[in-house]
């Protein structure tokens, strides 16, 4: 279908039409980008997670293709603030929340956990919900997440849903978001940075 059409490449490889370089993610993503042979532009975003650099570079590629000025592209990326439970950082009276509860699959779950592990923050807590629509891969995918958690040094991990409950795990488990709410009311965390991630149907955004 794409034969004969113009292709625009983007990524962190030097040969890409739109090349990006990660600066840091502490906790917000900061990166540089340039068109092939052009000048570098630095962008400080309001997105959590170094994995979001590819999404940002895709937006850059679309903008440059349609002739948007490079400074305007960088400004738009800096000003964008997620409001859809995707890579949101929210500070409450008691804790700091990293909310990524719109969707979850094995790749995005691993990326979120790895990025959270790299964040230099105190008392890291995770509330992770089942990943839906995985079919026959459900059992293995959730066990892989649990094994990844076992290899990390997190202060506390809560697993939500029947798929996580069916794994070999040592973490605390909950049937659904309502059980988590009850636990949070009874033993409210204080001074924690909490990653909340799971499929949308797990309703973790309601916590």
Residue ranges and their predicted role:
Residues 12, 33-37:
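Short acidic, glycine-rich loop/turn motifs
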Residues 9:
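Predominantly soluble domains enriched in secretory-pathway, periplasmic, or organellar proteins
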Residues 23-30:
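A short, compositionally biased
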Residues 2-6, 16, 27, 37-42, ...:
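ATP-dependent carboxylate-amine ligase
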